[in-house]
UniProtKB/Swiss-Prot annotation:
Family classification: Belongs to the RNase HII family.
Name of the protein in its database record: Ribonuclease HII
Cellular compartments per GO CC: cytoplasm; ribonuclease H2 complex
BP GO annotations: DNA replication, removal of RNA primer; mismatch repair
Cofactor binding, per record: Manganese or magnesium. Binds 1 divalent metal ion per monomer in the absence of substrate. May bind a second metal ion after substrate binding.
PROSITE patterns listed in its UniProt record: RNASE_H_2
Keywords annotated in UniProt: Cytoplasm, Endonuclease, Hydrolase, Manganese, Metal-binding, Nuclease
Boundaries of every RNase H type-2 domain copy: 72-257
Reported cofactor(s): Mn(2+); Mg(2+)
Binding residue positions for a divalent metal cation: 78-79, 170
Main EC class the enzyme belongs to: hydrolase
Length: 257
């Protein structure tokens, strides 16, 4: 191989998958600083990819254990929006295929918005089935947020296109005959729950952005309904909306004044 330019070396390293590659052996002997920097970057990327693979395998242990028992339709379930002062609570149930793999998959709260959007599209494309459950602020006020979350999860399961054989749920037990395991911080421990958290989060964020367009004075597209200073000040100035949860403090106190 003739001596390549730095740019050519960069393109080659994108193709090279192993240190055993003859082209890599030539590049590693190239003493130019630019090439050595690229080699160092290549090693770091490989190390990161390996760590992501190990993390993914660790997060697949619940699903793999159930598959070993002959189960196929394993639904991960998670919720988003228990804490906000406005907007619905949204849940998702996701059944993933055995060969599903997205490196870097994690709890939706730990991902950037851009990554969540990308993963959302990939999960949508690969999942066997996805069900979403949405419970309005009015129902939250009627039955309380805990019961509303439970109801939204049951709705998400009912909205799946196939009946799950097993449920993996983030920190909740559901009144259903379907066998289940409740996992504390499940969105960081199970790929199915993690996928559900991303579907639920992106779905709810999009709804809150639409609400932001409808009521620009409240800034819903920025705080997603949480009780930020900006949000509380907007309520003080412009009043309580039908999208607000009247049973939540401090809105409850504002109404009673």
């Amino acid at each position: 191989m003739q001596k390549v330019t730095i740019q050519e070396a960069e393109h080659l390293l994108q193709e090279i998958m192993s240190e055993e590659d003859d082209r890599f052996q030539i590049l590693i002997k190239d003493e130019r600083k630019g090439v050595q920097k690229l080699i160092s970057k290549w090693y770091k990327q490989k190390e990161l990819a390996q760590k992501e693979k190990e993390k993914f395998l660790e997060m697949s242990k619940y699903e793999n254990a159930l598959r070993e028992k002959g189960l196929t339709y394993i639904a991960g379930i998670d919720e988003v929006g228990r804490g906000p002062l406005a907007g619905p609570v949204v849940t998702a149930a996701v059944i993933l295929p055995e060969d599903f793999y997205i490196p870097g998959l994690n709890d939706s709260k730990k991902l950037s918005e851009a990554k969540r959007e990308r993963f959302y599209d990939e999960i949508k494309a690969q999942a066997i089935a996805i069900g979403v459950g949405i419970v309005s602020p009015q129902v939250i006020d009627e039955i309380n947020i805990y019961q509303a979350t439970k109801q939204a999860m049951l709705d998400a399961v009912a909205n799946l296109s196939c009946t799950p054989e097993y449920l993996l749920i983030d920190a909740m037990k559901l009144p259903t005959p379907i066998p289940q395991t409740s996992i504390i911080k499940g969105d960081a421990k199970s790929i199915s729950i993690s996928a559900a958290s991303i579907i639920a989060k992106v779905t709810r964020d999009r709804m809150m952005k639409e609400l932001g367009e409808k009521y620009p004075a409240y800034g819903f597209e920025q705080h997603m309904g949480y009780g930020t200073k900006q949000h509380l000040e907007a309520i003080e100035v412009h009043g309580v909306l039908e999208e607000h949860r009247k049973s939540f403090a401090p809105i409850k106190d504002m109404i009673q004044k």
